[in-house]
Design a protein with these regions (language model features):
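Short beta-to-alpha linker loops that shape the active-site pocket of alpha/beta-hydrolase fold enzymes
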Residues: 7, 12-16, 98, 222
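Gly/Ser-rich "nucleophile elbow"/oxyanion-hole loop immediately N-terminal to the catalytic nucleophile
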Residues: 24-29, 36-72
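Short beta-strand/loop motif that positions the catalytic acidic residue
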Residues: 180, 186-188, 192
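Alpha/beta-hydrolase-fold serine-hydrolase catalytic core, especially in secreted/extracellular enzymes
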Residues: 87, 208-276
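Conserved alpha/beta-hydrolase "acid-adjacent" motif
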Residues: 193-199
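Short amphipathic alpha-helix adjacent to the substrate-entry channel of hydrolases
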Residues: 1-9, 204-208
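Accessory cap/linker subdomain of secreted extracellular hydrolases
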Residues: 3, 31, 49-51, 61, ...
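Extracytoplasmic/secreted proteins, especially bacterial periplasmic and envelope-associated proteins
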Residues: 29, 33-36, 68, 76-80, ...
Length: 276
């Protein structure tokens, strides 16, 4: 992407090593932390080279036109940030991403974790991603507060009943689709039994209902990236998508079929449709 004139920004989330805060899996706090990066890239937020030297760093090189893309949990954060309606976020490309955390962990009031993750729940994923714990000095100063945060998550997620409550509603980004100003290019695997298609399809349908520019590419893979998948033309489509929504290039990508589905019998064939 650099050779095509794009700069790449990598950002650690709340609770990651050398960061601050706690990992709270899909919470409003996590979403707003990533949103702050978009604000910084657009000159609305200050940033510093580190936490002690008070040396400010500006994103003066940025046009203010920003895209977000990632897979799985990080792709989920792309959706979350888009639902804030933050100015400057022109498009997102979430791959194998979650649009509703309740539907990821619960089905009909039952606990239904991803395949291979039996016993998993929201607080366990938060603990798994809490890499601040890998810094002994840092962790020693926060471990009691973090233990309290874990206890609060365990109570709020209400595993015993499986009920949908305010805790889960905060993590249901479908509630805020009408706030999205960015275009959306969804990529998902039909055979993904980690993040299932009950995440991407309701999201795409909600985008259609709101008239938000959207594209969905469903491949036959599992919980994977498909950038180099033979016959998918994924990278070419992504390049043209970004050229249009970040650089304003009139290349017709927005007029092409909105849905592409890889054939299960011939993986060189992609079925196209204007809607799902």
């Amino acid at each position: 992407f650099n050779e095509r004139g794009y700069a790449t920004v990598l950002c650690g989330g709340l609770g990651t090593r050398d960061s601050e805060g706690f990992t709270l899996t899909g919470s409003r706090e996590e979403v707003l932390a990533f949103k702050a990066v978009i604000d910084w890239l657009n000159g609305r937020c200050r940033a510093f080279t580190n936490k002690t030297d008070n040396i400010e760093i500006l994103a003066s090189w940025c046009t203010g036109n920003v895209a977000m893309t990632a897979k799985s949990y990080l792709g989920t954060m792309c959706i979350g940030v888009a639902t804030t309606g933050v100015e400057g976020l022109k498009t997102i490309i979430p791959e194998a991403a979650i649009s509703n955390w309740y539907a990821y962990y619960r089905t009909g009031g039952l606990n239904v974790p991803a395949i291979g993750w039996q016993g998993d729940d929201l607080n366990i994923l938060a603990k798994y991603c809490f890499s601040r714990a890998k810094d002994p000095e840092d962790y020693e100063s926060i471990k009691e507060a973090y233990a309290k945060a874990q206890d609060e998550m365990i109570q709020a997620q209400d595993r015993a009943t499986g009920n949908y409550n305010r805790f889960w509603d905060e993590r249901n980004y479908l509630n805020l689709v009408d706030k999205i100003k960015a275009s959306v290019f969804i990529v998902h695997g039909i055979n993904d039994w980690n993040v299932k298609t009950n995440q991407c399809i309701p999201f795409f349908e909600a985008l259609e209902k709101q008239g938000i520019p959207a594209k969905m590419m469903l491949h036959q893979g599992e919980h994977v990236y498909i950038h180099t998948l033979k016959d998918s033309n994924m990278l070419d489509i992504m390049y043209r998508w970004l050229e249009h929504y970040l650089k304003g290039v009139d290349n017709g990508i927005e007029k092409e079929p909105a849905v592409l589905v890889e054939s299960g019998s011939d993986q060189s064939v992609w079925m196209a449709s204007d809607t799902w």
